[in-house]
Amino acid sequence: MKFDCAIIGGGLAGLLCGLALNQHGLRSVIISRGQSALHFSSASLDLLSALPNGDHVTDVAQGLQQLAEQLPEHPYSRLGAEAVLKYATQTEALLAACGAVMQGDARRPHRRVTPLGTLRPAWLSPLEVPVAPLPSQGACLVGISGFADFQPHLAAAALGQHGVTAAAVEIELPLLDVLRDNPTEFRAANIARVLDDENMWPALHAALLPLAQQYDLLIMPACFGLADDRLYHWLQARLPCPLRLLPTLPPSVPGMRLHSQLQRQFIREGGAWLAGDEVVKISHRQDAVEAVWTRNHGDIALRPRFTVLASGSFFSNGLVATRDSVREPILGLDLHQTLPRESWYQRDFFASQPWQRFGVKTDALLRPLLGGQPFHNLFAIGSLLGGFDAIQLGCGGGVCAVTALHAARQIHALAGGRP
């Protein structure tokens, strides 16, 4: 099977790379083992929230310049501030084309409300997510009776520390009784499958209406809208006060919807999607990938002109750890790695952990190294890359997006298109 590009991994980085290649007229295939980390995410993306020295970033352009001085091995530092901001802007347009309506600005982070009521910097957030500043009075956090993945009283207390006085109430929704018999079924994704039925919308509206008449803002868990945001806009049009939604503990409905929107657009534009498959071997000669072999296709190889590794970090098995080593399991690529094992972590749980910086080494074009030499038609993107701590710096989503679009641009140029 011949393709212009084979993308290994169907998460945020892989999908954005595939979508960008579609726009360049290149035919690509994504090999996906299963659910990506997007299913467990809030669907908010961060670009750069903090610097290695602990300073908070309020101006991203300036922060990128400081990052290059403090952490030259960071993917942003290698690409340059101008390129990072350009790719971030292109990502916003890509997401909008997929129907993912976001709020935010690449140059200046906003602060979104988390499920625990804290404020966290973000680059892009779904339109329904509450962001600062919130009204100091008149907000109400609405829980669902029996739903343990969102605690309105805890969130209200945390918002109080930020000067927001919010009430906390729970609503009864008898239509969800079918899920209550088994606590493991009473999760956001399963609730959404019930509430997304248009026949159930009036019952949810009836439960929220008395609160909407009493308060100036309602904030409830994001437990509807798996496929689209029709119910959210339907409620917005009928409630007398604004409604906002908070992502819950995983699986996250906004994250699942974002993944679905990107995947549908990729396939709609002609991309191929190999679901539930896994790459077991990549054949290469000297510095060129020749074939990609998957578990489900046996002796039928994919023969792409270019290959992109978007297989993720430890969470997605893009990296595998043993007792004394970490490796990239498909090719055994060179890694950023700290040895010995005792130095993989710090005893302070909340400190930046060295293992978070493990990942594949690449050249300036994001081509991974094997024995110190890059492949000329293989690229690595997203959280598989090493040299940075995405949690400490608040840059995980941004690295996925920026490196995905950079790799797509390199492939387009090498394939004969204009750079």
Swiss-Prot record:
* GO CC list: glycerol-3-phosphate dehydrogenase (FAD) complex
List, alphabetically, the SUPFAM superfamilies matched.
FAD/NAD(P)-binding domain
Q: Does the keyword Nucleotide-binding apply?
A: no
Q: How does it assemble?
A: Composed of a catalytic GlpA/B dimer and of membrane bound GlpC.
Question: What cofactors does the UniProt entry give for this protein?
Answer: FMN
Q: Which NCBIfam families match?
A: glycerol3P_GlpB, PRK05329.1-1, PRK05329.1-2, PRK05329.1-3
Q: In which pathway does it act?
A: Polyol metabolism; glycerol degradation via glycerol kinase pathway; glycerone phosphate from sn-glycerol 3-phosphate (anaerobic route): step 1/1
In its UniProt entry, what is this protein called? Answer: Anaerobic glycerol-3-phosphate dehydrogenase subunit B
Biological source species: Klebsiella pneumoniae subsp. pneumoniae (strain ATCC 700721 / MGH 78578)
- Top EC class of this enzyme: oxidoreductase
A Gene Ontology annotation in the biological process aspect, one of them, is: glycerol catabolic process
What InterPro entries does this protein's entry cite?
FAD-dep_OxRdtase_2_FAD-bd, FAD/NAD-bd_sf, G3P_DH_GlpB_su
EC number(s) per UniProt? Answer: 1.1.5.3
Catalysis: reaction(s): a quinone + sn-glycerol 3-phosphate = dihydroxyacetone phosphate + a quinol
